[in-house]
Curated annotation (Swiss-Prot):
Alphabetized UniProt keyword annotations: Cytoplasm, Isopeptide bond, tRNA processing, Ubl conjugation pathway
Top-rank taxon, per record: Eukaryota
Modifications the protein undergoes after translation, according to the UniProt entry: C-terminal thiocarboxylation occurs in 2 steps, it is first acyl-adenylated (-COAMP) via the hesA/moeB/thiF part of the MOCS3 homolog, then thiocarboxylated (-COSH) via the rhodanese domain of the MOCS3 homolog.
Subcellular location: Cytoplasm
Covalent link (Glycyl lysine isopeptide (Gly-Lys) (interchain with K-? in acceptor proteins)) residue numbers: 100
Chief location: cytoplasm
Protein name: Ubiquitin-related modifier 1 homolog
SUPFAM superfamilies: MoaD/ThiS
Organism: Caenorhabditis elegans
Residues the record lists as 1-thioglycine modifications: 100
PANTHER family, per database record: RURM1 PROTEIN
Amino acid sequence: MSTIPVTIDFSGGAEFLVKAKAQKVQIPADSTLRDVLKFVRDNLVTDVHRINMLLNDDASEVAHGVITLINDTDTGLLLEYDTVIEAGDTITFVSTLHGG
């Protein structure tokens, strides 16, 4: 199976749930954003007790309050979870939830 290089970036508090704020990883070629969510769950999340702050229960969607960007474009303007990821893409997860 061939793979492609991508960068996955976390901010707005989401970085506290994973190994590092920005990570260069290899994912299977032809992956969609939904596949990336599962990759994040299975390979990058370190705080499994608070994963619901980033992803829903089956990692098919991001949690409410998390904005997802591909190359700085909101995925709502693309094909959302069906967007095919390309080599060199940057996928960013931004949590908009803040305590107070």
